[in-house]
């Protein structure tokens, strides 16, 4: 886990809120930091942008490059064509694989169609893929904690379909069976709620006491950091607004975390126009954060809308500083001078 992650929630809350618990008694906004783009999303979006610059339109992208409407619409206007399946891409064309990763069968399909591929899979997702392959080679049963049908889960499970079982939530544990309880390991989708994942793992361990942990934390640093920041500010908020799309797992989890941490209400919005003024009735403090696939321009739009309703004092709640940067895929890296 990168050193920017602060999982000590109580301490994080005191530190973060120490600077905002002053004499402000009127309407205010608590603005979570960190929020927005993570290193994997930044890399994926730049990958499509660079591919368009280098090769020109159209560039095909298998699935949404990241789960955000604004980002996808912006790239589509620039010449990206988003498809659901590889066979929708013309033979010989360029296709970018999304940040969520793909199964080996997708690479095989692309090769059969002579597609030129650029893999924008987040390196932290690739890490989970490699773990799945490693433990499948050792003939483990792999319990993949994640949301059934999510692109990332489909891709990871596809690395070892005969060894992976998806465990969607804590209640799904009762249905899990394994061949050898002494050779079972859990892995996870990178964008889950930390708390719900740990509850699922707790139940799995009750059923399989020798359950092994992944070699390193699978839930990504950015997912954890954003949840920590929301937990720090939510107890002070009557309302939390999470900027993000409905199909963004990590954004949806932030709404759940806010409610679980004490916010009276929490809502997910794509744009400022999605905000219902009725939400502000009786509200003094509004918390604002955004999912890991959300550009800052959308957060600024929400802050402007809040200011129109009198919430013009913005106070940061900082629980971590993120500096991680991932290298671009080699196919679109700038040539060395």
From Swiss-Prot:
Keyword Glycoprotein: no
Matches recorded under PANTHER family: 4-HYDROXY-3-METHYLBUT-2-ENYL DIPHOSPHATE REDUCTASE
UniProt-recorded name of the protein: 4-hydroxy-3-methylbut-2-enyl diphosphate reductase
A GO molecular function held by the record: metal ion binding
Lineage: Bacteria, Bacillati, Actinomycetota, Actinomycetes, Mycobacteriales
Gene name of this polypeptide: ispH
Cofactor remark from the record: Binds 1 [4Fe-4S] cluster per subunit.
Binding site for (2E)-4-hydroxy-3-methylbut-2-enyl diphosphate: 67, 100, 150, 190, 248-250, 293
Cofactor: [4Fe-4S] cluster
Binding positions (isopentenyl diphosphate): 67, 100, 150, 248-250, 293
Binding-site residues, dimethylallyl diphosphate: 67, 100, 150, 248-250, 293
Family statement drawn from the similarity comment of this UniProt entry: Belongs to the IspH family.
Catalytic activity: isopentenyl diphosphate + 2 oxidized [2Fe-2S]-[ferredoxin] + H2O = (2E)-4-hydroxy-3-methylbut-2-enyl diphosphate + 2 reduced [2Fe-2S]-[ferredoxin] + 2 H(+); dimethylallyl diphosphate + 2 oxidized [2Fe-2S]-[ferredoxin] + H2O = (2E)-4-hydroxy-3-methylbut-2-enyl diphosphate + 2 reduced [2Fe-2S]-[ferredoxin] + 2 H(+)
Top-level class of the enzyme under EC nomenclature: oxidoreductase
